[in-house]
Amino acid sequence: MVENVIYPAYLDASLSRSEGRRVAQSAAVEAPTVDEIAKAVQQVGYDAVIERDKRYSREFETRGRVLVNNADDATKNDIVQAVAAYVGILRD
């Protein structure tokens, strides 16, 4: 079983690539939450587990993270890109 981790910083439009953003600026959203990310992960078709007490190593504030379970058929980058697209759709 492959378990991928998605931090809100991966999708945050206010961060640069060197600060941790992993998607294109056009796909990023402003201040994504773990709840939005978890909902998007479920929309993509994977199981999501929210861990609110975790923080990304490049950030000082604790924003949590989302564990993506049973993602054996996709790479981490594919999952992050799909989740970013869905978070953008959820915001509209």
UniProtKB/Swiss-Prot annotation:
Top-level lineage group: Archaea
Pfam families xrefs: SRP19 (PF01922)
Molecular function via GO: 7S RNA binding
Keyword Iron-sulfur carried by entry: no
Keywords, in A-Z order: Cytoplasm, Ribonucleoprotein, RNA-binding, Signal recognition particle
InterPro entries: Signal_recog_particle_SRP19, SRP19, SRP19-like_sf, SRP19_arc-type
Gene3D superfamilies per UniProt: Signal recognition particle, SRP19-like subunit
CC terms in the record's Gene Ontology section: signal recognition particle
Keyword Cytoplasm: yes
Effect of loss of the gene: No effect on cell growth, membrane protein insertion, protein secretion, or ribosome levels.
Subcellular localization, as worded in the UniProt entry: Cytoplasm
GO biological process: SRP-dependent cotranslational protein targeting to membrane, signal sequence recognition
Similarity field: Belongs to the SRP19 family.
Quaternary structure, from the entry: Part of the signal recognition particle protein translocation system, which is composed of SRP and FtsY. Archaeal SRP consists of a 7S RNA molecule of 300 nucleotides and two protein subunits: SRP54 and SRP19.
Function as written in the Swiss-Prot or TrEMBL entry: Involved in targeting and insertion of nascent membrane proteins into the cytoplasmic membrane. Binds directly to 7S RNA and mediates binding of the 54 kDa subunit of the SRP.
UniProt protein name: Signal recognition particle 19 kDa protein
Organism per entry: Haloferax volcanii (strain ATCC 29605 / DSM 3757 / JCM 8879 / NBRC 14742 / NCIMB 2012 / VKM B-1768 / DS2) (Halobacterium volcanii)
